[in-house]
Every structure is written in structure tokens, then in C-alpha cells.
């Protein structure tokens, strides 16, 4: 939506290797509308955030977050949607020219399977109050993230 609404702005999106499979149709949207989105898939070869919850609440008893989990070859997935693909194993693999590229690019960012996912929402907290917590004034959220009514030019 952001890339369609603000074509004059660069859009960079981050998602996980599990999440992209739940919303894979968005790759067709990128291709169909020729959106120059830079999509970074954080690939820890499992449902990392669920694994963290299993560590926190179930003493690390994992079910379907490592063993029993598999994923497709994301290079082939990107090719199926006719998107450029980059496998990122270190910071040296990211080129400034990739970010300036006018096309959409699927970046497969390879992470260690035990990489912690942060920021994260603690149980019972709203979306804008994620861990690690930021030391912000009480009105910072409203001033920063909630647009004024009928104010397209300010967005």
C-alpha cells in the first residue's frame, strides 16, 4: 500500500522467512505494479519469533519451529515472480546500487537459526510499545506516528 500511495518515496520492507510464506501473494503485487520495493526477508530457517515464545513460556520445548519446519528455495520463489534476488550472508553482500535500483528486489538475509528477533511485542502491550523499550516523552507516539485528519500533504 505504501509503495502505491507514495511512488515518490523509497519503500523498504522487512519480514521473516515464515511470514513471507503467509503473505506470498504480495510478491505478485510487487511484480504486477512494478513496485521498486526492497524486500528484506530475515531468514533464520524457522519461525524465530514463535521459537522465542517457546523459549520464554515453554522452557525451550520446540514444536514445528525447527524440526518439522522447511522452506522453499527463496531464489526460485523470487524467480517465479520474476523479481531480482540477492542472497545476503554478510553486510558486504549488500550493494548501495541495489538500494538505488529502480526495480523491486528480494533480499534473502541469512541469519543464524537462534538469532533473536527484536523489536518484539511483550504480552499485553500495544504494537507501538515493543521491547527494547525506547525512552520517549509520553506524547512522542502521537506526534510522530498518528497523522492529522485530512492532511495528505503532511504525510
Language-model segments: residues:
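Thiamine diphosphate
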Residues: 1-155
Amino acid at each position: 500500500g505504501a509503495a502505491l500511495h507514495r511512488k515518490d518515496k523509497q519503500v523498504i520492507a522487512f519480514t521473516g522467512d515464515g511470514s513471507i510464506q503467509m503473505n506470498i501473494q504480495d510478491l505478485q503485487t510487487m511484480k504486477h505494479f512494478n513496485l521498486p520495493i526492497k524486500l528484506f526477508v530475515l531468514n533464520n530457517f524457522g519461525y524465530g519469533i514463535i521459537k522465542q515464545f517457546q523459549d520464554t513460556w515453554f522452557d525451550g520445548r520446540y514444536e514445528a519451529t525447527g524440526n518439522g519446519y522447511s522452506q522453499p528455495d527463496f531464489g526460485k520463489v523470487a524467480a517465479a515472480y520474476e523479481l531480482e534476488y540477492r542472497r545476503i550472508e554478510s553486510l558486504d553482500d549488500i550493494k548501495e546500487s541495489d538500494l538505488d535500483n529502480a526495480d523491486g528486489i528480494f533480499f534473502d538475509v541469512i541469519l543464524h537459526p537462534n538469532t533473536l528477533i527484536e523489536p518484539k511485542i511483550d504480552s499485553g502491550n500495544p504494537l507501538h510499545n515493543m521491547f527494547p523499550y525506547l525512552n520517549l516523552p509520553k506524547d512522542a507516539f502521537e506526534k510522530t506516528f498518528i497523522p492529522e485528519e485530512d492532511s495528505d500533504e503532511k504525510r
